[in-house]
Amino acid sequence: MDKSTVYFTDFRCPVGTSQLDKLKKLCIAAGIKDIDMDGKFVAIKMHFGELGNMAFLRPNYAKVVADLCKEQGGMPFLTDCNTLYPGSRKNALEHLNCANLNGFNTITTGCQIIIGDGLRGTDEVEVPVVNGEYCKTARIGHAIMDADIFISLSHFKGHESTGFGGALKNIGMGCGSRAGKMQQHASGKPAINEELCRGCHRCAKECGSDAITYVNKKAVIDYDKCKGCGRCIGACSFDAVYNPNDSANELLDRKMAEYAQAVCHGRPHFHIALVQDISPNCDCHGENDAPILPDIGMFASFDPVALDQACADACLKATPIENSQLGEHLAEPG
């Protein structure tokens, strides 16, 4: 198998050149203009950010990609699917309001926004997963599968369950309908180590399903309500919330990869990732901690796996920021 090519540019900008200029040149160098877009619908998948989060990609970047598509005769639209857990993006109306409040609209992005799985997150297509081992079919947002061409625009950052969130997570989890997200998260649900639990209530505040209560100042999970999203794991500062299934995160990763394959298979696709504002957790949180690594640059490729690998390799070579979650953990003895 031939090696895939990943293109890169850093964020350094001499006078007269902007990051937006560099993103456009990167996409062109990586081959976006080799895709025949004339008269075709182009889905640009990105994350609009949860309300309160400030680490998500700016709408200006989306406009660069949308404008490139329009220059080639394409009809682009930005898209994402509704969330499994309650929040500001659990249905299409609130999702669109969230996108607007975070700066995404027709003026700032140059195109329309369509929520991929409809009003309630039930407008889905069951797509076969070619040679799927963990998922025989994937439940994908209908509007996303209706598009002729698929482009992912991803913010590369940390993630409490998958280690990092990049192109594969943006595509696989992000394009899943609410039922599709449930299928991927079904690998395992968290548990509480009572000896480590401080009764601080952070996990309960983070839980969007009201699945965590307290008995004798210790957290208790209602598994009938728990969705298995893992947000409570990232919220706990004392390692009291954990996944008892040692393979749960690996299964989640594998299911996401199969979902990503279902989204991309059989049509032209192109992928972009910006490694900046590298927060330790997902942009699905209603807050973001300080970046754990310095801004690195922008990547583009026709191969989302190679893209994620290149981003991860670049992050592993970077020096952690001292006054950050990662820097503090590395400084701790043992």
Please place each PLM-identified region on the residue numbering:
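Terminal amphipathic helices with adjacent charged low-complexity linkers/tails
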Residues: A66-D67
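Extended, low-polarity segments enriched in aliphatic/aromatic residues
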Residues: D2-Y61, E71-D80, Y85-G334
